[in-house]
Structures are given as structure tokens and as C-alpha cells.
């Protein structure tokens, strides 16, 4: 058999088992652990003189109806919280992932994976020198402006979870869409936006009826926020309805400790599943020791990207953010004290360490309300790199690569938010049967700027050159909406998630919705143990005077980095 060098093979088909890929300008390196394409020398490849030709890699007679793929991504490196770091062909049909393995024509190729047959119905993406991830999910979004969708897609985020009705003061501070009329208007509005949505209703009600009517009107979950009163009674009432209707509850706790301390809020949870937003506390919540929630097995903790990674300017920018978002007045001493109580350098530094240990399970943005929606994926990878430089290799990492650490951070922005919201059976990972929301990255731009964003198996967003040019690549190159973002294709490639109650009551027909509408499920049985690669339950102590954080008795701190990877090299501003 003819042999070629490893370098020549990588030039032709991309890296394979044992090869390492540097992620951007970071110090993170992933190593391909497994090659799912069975054997070498029979690779499927698109192009002139390549193998994806009729009678060669392309099967002659199989129709799409009979199982021929719609799209194949060839020879791509997959980085996925469930699959690991693997080399594979990835097949897509009818907007769903068929599987990973070896694609092609079983009449001419050995070892073609069942279901991954290519033919006349199949188009191709050459993944040889690209990285494939699941589309990201931002679990903490204030729906302040519809243009947020453009920022999200430009960083590989394909699902938004939050609430609001636009740039009103309530939405500037709280991620809820309050009441049936507002929910209906938002469900109608997002029909034209090429991204998945889940809308949270206002959970701040000790009365049951206002909560139920929001679920029946299309809310996919609840958010309890201190600006509307995050009291133990409110939390208990909201969780009781959530238990009955199988929806998630997110909570922004009581910064001022007016209705109780962190221990009282934890007691109000009563062991029930709950998602704690910005669990460090700079974004809001019990001061100064909200971090204790990350040690509870029923609590699914996330934090938000403005403090990740903790850099030399992180603390300085937070005060003004808080004043604007929560309608505070710098001339009122109590308002200033409120803002200052949330900004604690020690707990902000500890937040990054706890992420690195897998104790905080998710990262969201807190979009336009202290966070940056277009940087969620970016901040995850930046934090992973900053922590490697500060703390060294993780115990779980194999010698010579950072696979476990990278996969831990990928899980924080893909599968764990999906599981928490009750949509992990539909999105969040690259698994057979899941919706084909996928992101392709050039390794040099990993986590920063994707090459292609697929929604439901069709390209929705891409870095595209001059449409009048002779090639796709001439300048000016910038992100533009693609065909999945137009016409009725948009409605077949993006999902609106709602409660089962709304789904069963025909919310799509009632409101004339044309998008795919799917119910959430399984939210009340999720605990910290279900958080992929991020299930650590430490004992947390916070010194009330110095705010120093101890994790299992050890001071959790690092020096804030003076420079951060994937940063100014990649952006003009």
C-alpha cells in the first residue's frame, strides 16, 4: 500500500489521531483522540479530481427520500462536550444530524457508516482544515434589541434564552417577558429572526394564576429577579408551579439580604432544581457570599461574561454597568452603596478559578445589561486559556494536550445550558438525531470568529465577501445573513421553545406562528450531577471582611492576567 508522510496527510485531509491543533493565539492545544472514519486511504473529499464524484464517493441510485444525505461535512475535527475531540465525516439530513463516522458510497468504499451515504442529493462542506462545534447557547439574555441576534451568530451562538420586550427599563434590568400579551407580541416578533429562542416569564408572584397564564401563553420557563422581589415566598411559589408544569426556574437573588441571607434562599429552594444566574454576585445576588450556591447538588450555577476572565480592568468597569442596568442614581448614597456591594475583586477572581475546577457549570452573557452577547463563546475560551496560564494543566488532562479543559469550557456554552433549560434532547451537542445547529471555525479564529454558522442544516450566517466579486473571498469580508435567514426557510431552521402547557394548547395556531415550535421537558429532574464536565460540588467559604474565597479550605485566587489571548490581535476596536 502506498504511504505518505503525516505532514502530507495533514495537508490533504487535515489532522488525524495524535495530531495537535493550537486554538487561536492561545496556549490551548487539542489532540485528536479518535478517528471515526475507519481506515486511511479511502477518504471522502469534494473538489476537482477528488472522490465525491458519481460512481466513486457518490452513490448512483439512492434518493433523498430513501436516506441520501442532504449535506456532508468531510474530514472535520469535532470538538464536542459529549463526543470529545475526534475526526469524522458528519452527515445531515432533513435538518438533523444523522451521525458521525465515515461518509460515502458503500458500493465503492469499505466501512461507510450506516446512514452516511452520499449521492446526487448531497452537498458538501470541506472540513479538512476546520473545527466543528455545536451551536452555542446563551442562557442569560435580556431581549433589549433584535440586532442582538447578529452579534450572537457572529460568535457562534445559535440559541438565546432569556426575556424582555425591548429597551424599556424593566428589560434593561430583568430577563423576563411579563404576562400573556407581552409574550404573544415577542413570539410574533421573533418569527423573523434566524436563531432559536426560549422566553422566560416573570416568576415574581406569590399568586399561582399569573404564573400559569404565562406558561400557557408561551413562556418556556421562569425568572425570579430581585428587582421585582426575590423573597423566599416568591421563590417557593414559582418553584411549585415549575414542578407542576415541568419548566426551568432561573433566579437572581437578593443583593441587599433584605428578605434573608443566602442560606434562607437555599432553604427556599427546598432541594428543587434551580438555575442561579451570575453565581459570583457582581451581576447581582446575596452579598458577599452568593458563591456558596455552587456547592449545592440541586443548584445549576452559571455566571456571566463581563467578569470572565477576571482581567486588570474587570472591577473598574462594573460600577457604571450596575448603575445603568438597575436604574440607580449616583446622587443617592444608598444606590451607590448597592452598586458597590456587588463589586468584590476577591470573589470575581475566585469565579474564574471555580469555572476551571468545574464548579460553575455554565457561562451566559447578561446581554446589554452588564454583558456582551457577541462574546460568550469567546470569553469561555479566553478564560480556559487564562486559567491554564495561571493554574497549569488540569489533573484530568492527558500529557501534552488541553482536551479536558477545552471540553469543560465548551460544555459551559453548549450542552449544559441546553440541559438546564430542558432542550438538551434537541440541541447542545453533535449527536445523532439532534437539530443541526453547527458552527465551523478556522483553528486560528477558534472561539472568536466562525467561518460558517448552520441553522437546522442550512447556512444562516457567514463571513462573506463582496457579492459582486468573481469569488466569495474578495474584500470587504464581513458577516452577512445567508439563505437560512430568509423567507420561509428561516421558519423551518429555527426553533421557538415553549412550555408543554403552551404547546398542548396550540400556541402556534393561536398566534399564527410559522416557526418550528417545540416544548421543553425534563427540567425538574436535572441536578448538578447532570452538568457535563462541570459537576464539582465544593464547600465554599467567603470571608465577610476581606471577601476571600476558600474552596474546600484552600484560598481560591490567581493574579489577574495583564494580557488576554484572542483579544486585540483579532479586533480593530
From Swiss-Prot:
Reactions the enzyme catalyzes: urea + 2 H2O + H(+) = hydrogencarbonate + 2 NH4(+)
Residues carrying N6-carboxylysine: 223
GO annotation terms (biological process): urea catabolic process
Primary subcellular site in the record, as a coarse category: cytoplasm
Stored PANTHER family: UREASE
Amino acids binding Ni(2+) 1: 140, 142, 223, 366
Name of the protein this chain belongs to: Urease subunit alpha 2
Main function: Disrupting the ure2 operon has no effect on urease activity or pathogen survival in BALB/c mice when administered orally.
Keyword Hydrolase: yes
Annotated compartments: Cytoplasm
Keyword match Hydrolase: yes
GO cellular component: cytoplasm
Species whose genome carries this gene: Brucella abortus (strain 2308)
Post-translational modification: Carboxylation allows a single lysine to coordinate two nickel ions.
Protein encoded by which gene: ureC2
Cofactor note: Binds 2 nickel ions per subunit.
Entry annotation: catalytic residues: 326 (proton donor)
Cofactor(s) recorded in Swiss-Prot or TrEMBL: Ni cation
GO molecular function: nickel cation binding; urease activity
Binding site for Ni(2+) 2: 223, 252, 278
The Urease domain, residue ranges: 135-573
Self-association and partners: Heterotrimer of UreA (gamma), UreB (beta) and UreC (alpha) subunits. Three heterotrimers associate to form the active enzyme.
This protein's UniProt keywords: Cytoplasm, Hydrolase, Metal-binding, Nickel
Family recorded in the similarity comment: Belongs to the metallo-dependent hydrolases superfamily. Urease alpha subunit family.
Enzyme Commission number(s) of this protein: 3.5.1.5
Protein's pathway: Nitrogen metabolism; urea degradation; CO(2) and NH(3) from urea (urease route): step 1/1
